[in-house]
Amino acid sequence: MIDTDIPKILAIKYARFVDDRQFDSMREIMVDNFTQSGPGFAAGSLDEFIANLQVLNNYSATFHLVGNQYGEWQNDLYRGETWSVASHIYEKDGEQRKLDMGIRYQDVIETEGTVFKYLSRDLVIVWTQDLPTTV
């Protein structure tokens, strides 16, 4: 029987690796032929995905909050969805701002024995909000 916490664990690691800028650590949770698509971008391999993550260096910080999850295992393959709110802190015209995104990740995870990795993780952006920050 497959541990039902696996999708949550992978999603939390993904958020941590992004927020801590540990982009190469994605290799721990993604297959080499990992793919991702979203509005205005795509990656056809894990190397391309990691290269795409460099755009996040334009932000002074990010904060990805992992929320609801729903999905099912069928043999060694999981297909499901992860809800997330991603905050991106940046400066514009001398003002600190926060771009928030409501995201629904479309997750596909495979298992080989005791190793679980993403095959794909597509993004559906439900909403965005860009406001000045208050500290």
Predicted regions, residues:
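A solvent-exposed, acidic/Ser-Thr-rich amphipathic alpha-helical stretch
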Residues: 23-86
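Short beta-strand edge/turn micro-motifs at domain boundaries
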Residues: 79, 102-135
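Short, cysteine-centered beta-strand-loop-beta hairpins and adjacent loop/turn segments enriched
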Residues: 87-97, 128-129
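Short aromatic-glycine motifs in intrinsically disordered, low-complexity regions
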Residues: 58, 96-98, 110
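A structural preference for long, well-packed, hydrophobic secondary-structure segments
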Residues: 13-14, 84-85, 102
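Short, low-complexity N-terminal intrinsically disordered segments enriched in polar/charged residues
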Residues: 1-24, 28-32, 47
